[in-house]
Each structure stands twice: as C-alpha cells, then as structure tokens.
Amino acid sequence: IDGYVDNELFIDEDLYLEYIDKYGKPEAGDVMVTGVGTLGVCYVVKQEDRFYFKDGNILWFKQKAKDRILPEYLVKAFDSKDVKEFIDKNSSGTTVGTFTIQTAKKMEISLPSIEEQRNIIQKITKIESVIKQRRQELQLLDDLIKARFVELFGDAIHNDKGWETDTVEKLCKEIYGGGTPSKSHPEYYEDGDIPWVSSKDMKTDVLTDSQIKINQLGVDNSTAHMVPINSVIMVIRSGILKHTLPVAINAVPITVNQDLKVFIPNERVLTRFLSVQFKMHEKDILSGVRAVTADNIEFNSLKQRELIVPPIELQQEYVTFLEQIDKSKVAVQKALDETQLLFDSLMQEYFG
C-alpha cells in the first residue's frame, strides 16, 4: 500500500525458513506485482524486508539483469497507460481479473540505457511529487471547509448547537433521478450539446461538463430530465460509495443518469449549504450503503435524514466563506491539471 508491504497475516519462523530453503526469497531490488484484484500494483523489495507471499496473488520479478533495468524504472513502466491497458486487455477471469506469469512474459516495455533510466526516474518522480503536493493542498482546503462548518454550526449529525432540524425531503422543492436515452437510438446522442452526467463525471464540486452528451431528442424520449442550474447532485449507486460520497452543484443546465439524484432546495436552505451538509454526513450515509447488484444508498432513508437548518443569514455567511475558498481551489486545481498533463505527456513519451 503506497509503496509499503501491509503485513496483515503472519507465519512462524520455521515455516518462513522452510519456504526460503525450498523456493528462495525476494531480494532487495526485486519487484513484487499484484496479480489478482487490483492488478499491476508494484512494490520494490528493500534490504531490511522479511516477508513471504501467497503464490498466484503476487508476481515476483527477480532482479537478474541489474545492468539492464532498474527496479524503479520497471515500477514507472507499470504506471504507464500502455502497460495498464495491456494488463486490462490480457487479464483473465470473469469477476476477478488475474495478471498471470504467462501474460507478464509477453509484456513489452522500452529499455533505454541505465543512465537514461535514472534520468527518466528522476524526472517522473519530481513531477509525481508536485502532483502529490497539489492534491494535499486541495485536501487542506477541503478540511478548512469542514472546520469552518463545525466552527459555525457544530456537529451536523448530533446537532450539539440545537439548531432547528428537518428532513431532506422537506428541505427540497424537488428530488428526482435521471435516466439513460436508449443506446439503440444513436440519434439521441448525435451532435449532443447537453451534458449527461454519470458517476464518472462527479469528480469536482462544480459540474460544467460531462464525458457523454445528449441532444434534445434524447431528453424528450427518456427520463433524463433537464436539471436547472444550482441544483445539488449526488451519486446514489456506484462502486465509489464503498469509500466516497460524490456530491456536486451544477453551474450549467445538465441531465443525469439513473445512478444520480437531483436535489432542488427550497427557500429554507442554500444550495451550497445543503451540498456541504451532505458531505458532513458522508461517513454516516456510507455506513448504510447496501451491496446488491451494485453499491447503493437506500433512497427513502436518505430522504428522511434529519439536517440542521440554521438561520439563512448564517448560512449565507458560510457560503461567502466558501466562495473565497473556491478561488484558491480553482488556482490549485489549474496548477494540478497542468502538472498532470505534463506527467501524462512524459509517460507517453517514455513508455508509449
């Protein structure tokens, strides 16, 4: 995990020595790669490491040609788009993909000189460090948003400041879901200029676009209703609900698919305040996520969830604070996007 071995299971010393005697053991500089579940995650063995592994779940790349390839270079190669696509395309298994030794042997990567590999590693590592820093800055701003909320309003779930409360349903003029125009009618998507938002698009706090767009014909012939500007959008069915509750506000008119819900607040609650309050309830909401055919939120329960309703003037004070934070987030996000673009370009140049 994050470049470290997470030891959850242990074997005794005698068994460890028996395995080493029979099969050898990973040495410093060898690369271990996940072969089941999340594929292609790498770990470079360190000098002080003492561990063994479950054969079949982990691929062991022994460092036999130290004069030809650096272990860190191999790790960077596994992070490249081309190698990831190769693994995805060639992974076997219906529900759980597997990356096998046979597949690994067919994998090809460019192999420059050791000196050039060192230069590539240095450049990529430096850019990765900048990307990590930018993401940390965004996280700090998100933490500041939550801290200011608690400062003004207290605990949103336990309501320790004794605010008036009401249900999500009663704080909204409308709550509705979306739909998918039939894919068997390509004319619903031709020259589409209306964003059709899915969980894949819910990566920012403010929605302005989507990967797929539909046209008015698609809207008229489906349940993908037009969503007015300044509505709250939430993902209620997706694997991402295992760990994150995506919530956003749309800055342009959009449509959404059936995995999302739209909340149009009434005059008692401001849109931004409602959006942040959902995020303050994130852990509690996700604790009730059910996995049936897909991870999903029990919607009737969500509609009956009690939210705090402070005076609108205090909500506005908080929203004004958010607008100042937004300016900082936009600047950091722009820097992150530019750095990510440079990273992607270099990875394609070196490993494409």
Predicted regions and their residues:
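A short glycine-rich beta-alpha junction/loop motif
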Residues: 35, 51-59, 69-72, 91-115, ...
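Periplasmic-binding protein-like
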Residues: 83-86, 281-285
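A short beta-sheet element
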Residues: 21-79, 198, 215-279, 298
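Short coil/turn segments at secondary-structure boundaries
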Residues: 7-9, 89-91, 161-165, 181-188, ...
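Sequence-specific dsDNA recognition surfaces
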Residues: 1-31, 169-185, 200-229
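Short, solvent-exposed loop/turn positions at domain surfaces
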Residues: 20, 47, 132, 183, ...
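Non-catalytic DNA-recognition/assembly elements of restriction-modification systems
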Residues: 106-122, 129-179, 191, 204, ...
